Regions:
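Short coil-to-beta-strand transition motifs
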Residues: 2-4, 15-19, 66-69, 124-133, ...
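Periplasm/extracytoplasmic soluble domains of Gram-negative envelope assemblies
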Residues: 25-29, 35-38, 45-47, 55, ...
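N-terminal beta-strand block that forms a small beta-sandwich/beta-barrel module immediately after a flexible targeting
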Residues: 1-38, 44
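Acidic- and glycine-rich mobile interface elements
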Residues: 151-155, 176-178, 189-231
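Short conserved beta-strand and strand-loop elements enriched in small hydrophobics
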Residues: 117-125, 167-169, 188-194
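Structural microfeature recognizing short secondary-structure transition sites
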Residues: 124-126, 130-176, 211
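Conserved hydrophobic positions within beta-strands
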Residues: 9, 22-24, 40, 74, ...
Length: 231
């Protein structure tokens, strides 16, 4: 049942942020490619297997054994034993799952607001209850995109490279600002009682803070009474 609500504005804090979907990436990844037609004589590893640095990966018909350049996990084997590998084609992929970062792609307008060391809030769909944080490491152009590299403080062990994450990059935090309920705003206007007089005023909105929104520039006074229909 709808009811008329009257409430005074409150003071609070708001955070202006850039929101984007990011992807977890490994700090160390390696793709083995060969430079000549070669037959795989033997595989020493399988997909999903953890290997140590310098562990043997595969043996070719030239008698060459290729080894792991670092400790990690085999994430892809593209060929089986006895198959011929053509030059420059990926043979296997090795990834360090323990050291990761996050890559976010932004449009130009959002990218202009990003600076190194800005705080970032991270949220994974399956573990929304966990508060995860990071910082902006760098921003750079790549292939017509503007990419942001985020270094997380820590990530749960179940988070793997190529998983997606919601990111909120903190641009600015403002304290002691005037906030009014979002529900009180209709078509960019709000109805107020000011010194025993009812008024409907057009307002400019600032940042959101849950169900409240910032009203900058003194448009709403602390003693105003906000009148609206609560559904």
């Amino acid at each position: 049942m709808n009811k008329i609500v009257s409430v005074k504005p409150k003071r609070g804090s708001v955070v202006e942020a850039v929101y984007a979907l990011g992807t977890v990436k490994s700090d160390n990844s390696y793709t083995l490619r060969l430079m000549a037609n070669t037959v795989i004589k033997r595989k020493f590893v399988s997909e999903g297997e953890s290997v140590l640095k310098n562990s043997p990966l595969l043996l070719t018909d030239y008698g060459i054994i290729f080894s792991a350049p670092f400790s990690g996990t085999i994430t892809r084997l593209h060929f089986e034993e006895g198959e011929t590998i053509t030059p420059a084609v990926p043979v296997l992929n090795l990834m360090d799952l323990s050291k990761t970062h996050i890559i976010v792609s932004l449009d130009q307008q959002s990218a202009l607001k990003i600076k190194k060391n800005q705080n970032v809030e991270l949220s994974f769909e399956s573990i929304r209850n966990k508060k995860l944080k990071g910082t902006v490491d760098k921003i750079y152009p790549s292939g017509g995109q503007f990419l942001v590299k985020i270094k997380p403080e820590t990530l749960p062990s179940e988070i793997l490279p190529e998983m997606t994450v919601d990111t909120a990059i903190e641009i600015e935090k403002r304290d002691n600002v005037i906030l009014i309920p979002v529900a009180s705003i209709k078509r960019g206007q709000v109805e107020i009682q000011r010194k025993d007089k009812m008024e409907r005023i057009k307002i400019r909105l600032g940042a959101l803070a849950g169900r409240w929104v910032e009203i900058p520039d003194g448009q709403i006074l602390p003693d105003d009474l906000i009148i609206y229909m609560d559904k």
